[in-house]
UniProtKB/Swiss-Prot annotation:
Reported effect, Q239E: In plasmid pINV_F6_M1382
Mutation effect (E64D): In plasmid pINV_F6_M1382
Subcellular location field: Secreted
TM helices/strands, residue ranges: none
Domain notes: The N-terminal domain is an intra-molecular chaperone that prevents premature oligomerization of the residues on the coiled-coil region that are involved in interactions with the needle and/or itself. The residues in the C-terminal domain probably form oligomeric structures at the tip of the needle that are responsible for the regulation of secretion of other effectors.
Protein name: Invasin IpaD
Source organism phylogeny: Bacteria, Pseudomonadati, Pseudomonadota, Gammaproteobacteria, Enterobacterales
Alphabetical GO biological process terms: effector-mediated activation of host programmed cell death by symbiont
Length: 332
């Protein structure tokens, strides 16, 4: 089954990548405090393990997002792995913060030498920073790309998936609103009122649903930037509470409603086969637009995870290099 048959497989699924369990975070905080307070050097080991976990989970998430088959199970796995990454990112940031504030236990003579050195040095006019300052910057980088980039896509995919799930329910009901129009088999009877009501309810529910940001509002410039990033046909920039948001573009639903109005009548409408096929082709084209939008978002989310994975790889390498340098420096 590919993305075009998503309607039957995700109608009851719940994609909530930001639904991280609060008690899990508290447990992580407790574990970090207990371990680092009793043995500060272990925070480096914990950080290395956590970054490794992020990469492993992210690789699994990228594999799921690259699949052409999206099922209820795969969507649940995507949500689970997204939440796990968010929790591990939070843990990494805390560990990096601890490393930036606490002294790394080193050789006594080396510590005295370091304390006697200038706090800052100049090399070719560029300011040098300590490893603890570097780790603090790394912590900020991890948080920034997670909060301001990865989670934006998580929320956008979640919101659009929920909308399409509800549209899938309308499609499932459509079969019951179509019946033969006569005994000759040359006409079709369509319950226009029932279909129109379902589409209007869907539009009312999601017309103000934000793809970005998840909460509050942003500037018009920022909203336009993310509309372009997410895909111009997926959303639209609209005003809200004095600011701007990127809302779900409901144009496909609007076009479906217009096509029903063009059939004439608001109750049962009898269409000859040619007219029904023409209407159904237009209706299906709008459905295809929404499917393509969802597929585009999923692909962009996969690309965002690739960028995040590369960042974690670079940060892991940076931390390892710092640690190796410290070991060489203290080996005397």
């Amino acid at each position: 089954m590919n993305i075009t048959t998503l309607t039957n497989s995700i109608s009851t699924s719940s994609f909530s990548p930001n639904n991280t369990n609060g008690s899990s975070t508290e447990t992580v905080n407790s574990d970090i405090k207990t371990t680092t307070s009793s043995h500060p050097v272990s925070s480096l080991t914990m950080l290395n393990d956590t970054l490794h976990n992020i990469r492993t989970t992210n690789q699994a998430l990228k594999k799921e997002l690259s699949q052409k088959t999206l099922t209820k199970t795969s969507l649940e796995e995507i949500a689970l792995h997204s939440s796990q990454i968010s929790m591990d990112v939070n843990k990494s940031a805390q560990l990096l913060d601890i490393l930036s504030r606490n002294e790394y236990p080193i050789n006594k003579d080396a510590r005295e030498l370091l304390h006697s050195a200038p706090k800052e040095a100049e090399l070719d006019g560029d300011q040098m920073i300590s490893h603890r300052e570097l780790w603090a910057k790394i912590a900020n980088s991890i948080n920034d790309i997670n909060e301001q980039y990865l989670k934006v896509y998580e929320h956008a995919v979640s919101s659009y998936t929920q909308m399409y799930q509800d549209f899938s329910a309308v499609l499932s009901s459509l079969a019951g609103w179509i019946s033969p129009g006569g005994n000759d088999g040359n006409s079709v009877k369509l319950q226009v009122n029932s279909l129109k009501k379902a589409l209007e309810e869907l539009k009312e529910k999601y017309k103000d649903k934000p793809l970005y940001p998840a909460n509050n509002t942003v500037s018009q410039e920022q909203a336009n930037k993310w509309l372009t990033e997410l895909g111009g046909t997926i959303g639209k920039v609209s005003q809200k509470n004095g600011g701007y948001v990127v809302s779900i573009n409901m144009t496909p639903i609007d076009n479906m409603l217009k096509s029903l109005d063009n059939l004439g009548g608001n109750g049962e409408v009898v269409l000859d086969n040619a007219k029904y096929q023409a209407w159904n082709a237009g209706f299906s084209a709008e459905d295809e637009t929404m499917k393509n939008n969802l597929q585009t978002l999923v692909q962009k989310y996969s690309n965002a995870n690739s960028i995040f994975d590369n960042l974690v790889k670079v940060l892991s390498s940076t931390i390892s290099s710092c640690t190796d340098t410290d070991k060489l420096f203290l080996h005397f």
